[in-house]
Structure formats: C-alpha cells, structure tokens
C-alpha cells in the first residue's frame, strides 16, 4: 500500500480553502449577463471558449492533492445543482465559496464546527422556505421565453425557440438539442408519436420525391412476435383488402414469404401496405407496443395473452389519421385511442418513473410519456464555427433545463434579488451563540451572487447590494443595462427550483468542509525512487579514436 500524507485541523482546512478558491474564482467570472469567457485547453483540437460554469469546473484538476480535494468538493456542488435543476451551477459555486470561507474563519477563531453547521442548515431551510413563498407560477409563453433568455446568457432567440417548442409539444413533450447545419437556430417539431424504426423494404415507398411511405387513415396491426409465415397473415389481409384502407404492420420482424407477399401486393396495387419493426427490445418493446395500442385504439396480438394472427378480429386493429415512414423513423399522427385511456397510461408510466432508481430507465420512461402526451421538438443550434457550436449548445441545454424547472416550481425575481429578499423575511435563531454565528454567515453569503453579477458587469458590488436592499419586492439591478428597476417587469426571472437547488447544494457541501478535521492523500513519490542504480559511466573506452 502506498504511503499517505495526513494533515490535521487548521493546516488541513487552509489547504482545502486554497483549492476551493482556485476553482470558484475560475467559475464565478462566468456569472450573469456580463459574465466573462473562460478558455479551456483541450489535448486534441482547438481550445473551448465557454461561459458555462459546470464546464469550467469539470476541467479543473490541481497538482497539490490536498488543494485538489477542496476543488473537487466544490465541483460536487456544481454537479449536484446541475443534477437537481439542470442549471444554477455558477450560483451554487459562488454561494459555496462564500459560506466555506466565512465558516473556516469562524472555526479558526475557536467556534464549534458542528454548531456552525447546524446554524448554516437552519438558515438554509428558512431561506428555501422564503424562496418558495416568493415563487410565482410560470405558465405563459412570454415568461418561459424570458427564463430561457436569461439562462442562455441573454440570447433572445434561444428563449423564443424554447418557449415555442414547449407551446407546441406541451410541458410533458420531449425537447432535444442537436447541432444544426447552418448559421441560424431552427425548431423542428414532430407531431404525433415517433419511434426510431423505418420501413422494412424500400418497395413500400409511395412518395418517391421524399422517399417516404405516406398513409391516410390506415389500419394498424400490432404483433408481439416475428411474422414469417404467410398463412398466419391471410385472414387479416383479406379483411383489410375488403375495407379498401391501407395497412401498417408493426411487429418484432416481418421476413421471408410474408414480407415478399406484402411487397408484391403493394407493387400490384392489390392493397396498400407497409411493415416496420416494433420499437425497443425485450420488455421495453412489449410496453411500447402496448403504448401504440392505446394511442391507436387497437390491441396487441400477443401469444402470451392466448391470441393468434389467424384468429385475430378486425376490431383489434388500431387506426390513425396519418402515418409517415422514412428510412429510419415512423410517425403516427392523431391515433384513434380515447383521451381517457391515454391519460391512464401516462399516469401509470409516471408511477413507474417515481419508483425507478435507474437514470437510464427514467429517461426512457419520460420519452414514452412525452410520445403519448405531447410530441417531440428538436432545437437545431446554428453557429459559425465548431467552437461556437459547442459553447452555444451548452447554453441552450442550460436554458432548456431552466425553463423546465421554472414550469415545475415557478419563478422568482432574477439577478440574485430573490436571495436578498429572502434575508429580510428570515427570523431564525440558533440554540447557542455559535449556531447564531453559523446563521449570520450563511445569511451574509446570500449577498455573494448579486455582488458577483454586479462585479462582472463592472459595477461596485457593495453599492449595488445596499441599493437593492433599500428597495422592496422585485426591485433589483439589471446588469445587462446597468439600470435599477422591477426585475420581473424587465423580464429578468430565475426558476425558483434553480435558486433553491443552488443554495441547498452549496450549504450541504460547505457544512461538510467546515466540519472536516483531517485529510488523507497519497504521499508524492520521490523522483528516481525504485529505478535502476546509477551505472557510473562507461569506463575503459579511452583508446578509441574520435568519431567524425
């Protein structure tokens, strides 16, 4: 086992604070509308220029192992805030630095670290409650656009696109961010249910210009098995041919004689048909077929339920107003399923989300909810260079998370004003003097974000804090224009969830660091240790002539 270095007490905390300050100082310069850029070197390719706090934090690794531990713990603050609300990483880092530096001063002055932590926790709980009281619902498109704009560093186009996407696919809809091909940002909305399976044969294509299969008012056959026997399909095909409507077959697979017959009948014009593979794999495929059945008002033909294709009733077929299939995707628009059955299914999936512990499963379940309840919107980010593209994509991702958080828990006045207003409504008292010091230092730290926003904008932080404190309600400092006024009226809003999560993450890690009494790290390996001994030069070569 490698030798370890151990530090105790004040010397451990001092080292830790150095690391905290290095990381936080690099991250906090990005805060606010006038936040500065940070340039990050990459081992391969061009450097990255970013204003995203968590991207800066992730890149920082310090040489000194004790200092690095401090930096990594603050990095955890940014990650926690990002995981909970998807934004607010820089605010969380600024708050953590303020609480930690004040807290460690108090510990050095001889105060009880555990009481300080209890005081910080009490103050945090009181401020969180005050933020929740300040929150106003964020329901209209204008407010959503304003939140998106603020989070995307005052990029109004991004805010507008996110609001438009939410309006079109609903609050439950899937909104994804992709790299676009041009200079302009674009919004692409897919209405209806889309899944990533294309046609099984190009001979099904009926729109040669777009290379797609398009069906109006089709019948939809859903089968939970592989179809390769034509005899199984014949009864259904005869019924469909009589109806004169097109048929879409969604099955585990369609191959061999069955697929060949479908292709031949389609080419001859006997009836219009197309086949696609069912989405997903294993149990997820079964669940998604059931989703499709509920959406289209049909039934899954499953041998597990004692059903077979030969005996399938025409009433088990689903319907939709339109189906569009290309090489990679199938879109079912306006399925005939009842709203009540769709809502019941959505509630059922949401219950699964609540009980699931796997991030991957939760993501897939949320996608299913979105496909049933809303739709899918893709924001395509445009930029002039690859560097700009990466930076902008990060900002759009942040803005998207912020707007979702705003819809979830409402909005508060932005620019650090919500934390300042929370101070005036908090009346919490500790059980002893050391707890009161913890409460006081945590409340004082609430001023740190507005000081930093003002400082990054070239204003004097203390002057701005005093002026904002003298006002009431949503009166604050607009760092973008350098003016004071009503933040909500000016459209400067923060999601309450982001502000709350930032504070809770900062207080949690700060409490742990203040109560740290010892640090253990690998001792540095001395240069040359464990290598081969010195050979002492090569003697005895004296008589050789010099080489030209």
Curated annotation (Swiss-Prot):
Family matches, as Gene3D superfamilies: GroEL, GroEL-like equatorial domain, TCP-1-like chaperonin intermediate domain
Electron transport as UniProt keyword: no
Alphabetized InterPro entries for the sequence: Chaperonin_Cpn60_CS, Cpn60/GroEL, Cpn60/GroEL/TCP-1, GroEL-like_apical_dom_sf, GROEL-like_equatorial_sf, TCP-1-like_intermed_sf
Pfam families for the chain: Cpn60_TCP1 (PF00118)
GO molecular function, one term: isomerase activity
Entry's EC annotation: 5.6.1.7
Keywords on record: ATP-binding, Chaperone, Cytoplasm, Isomerase, Nucleotide-binding
A single Gene Ontology CC term: cytoplasm
SUPFAM superfamilies for this protein: GroEL apical domain-like, GroEL equatorial domain-like, GroEL-intermediate domain like
The protein's enzyme class: isomerase
PANTHER family membership: 60 KDA HEAT SHOCK PROTEIN, MITOCHONDRIAL (PTHR45633)
Family recorded in the similarity comment: Belongs to the chaperonin (HSP60) family.
Listed name of the protein: Chaperonin GroEL
Gene this protein is translated from: groEL
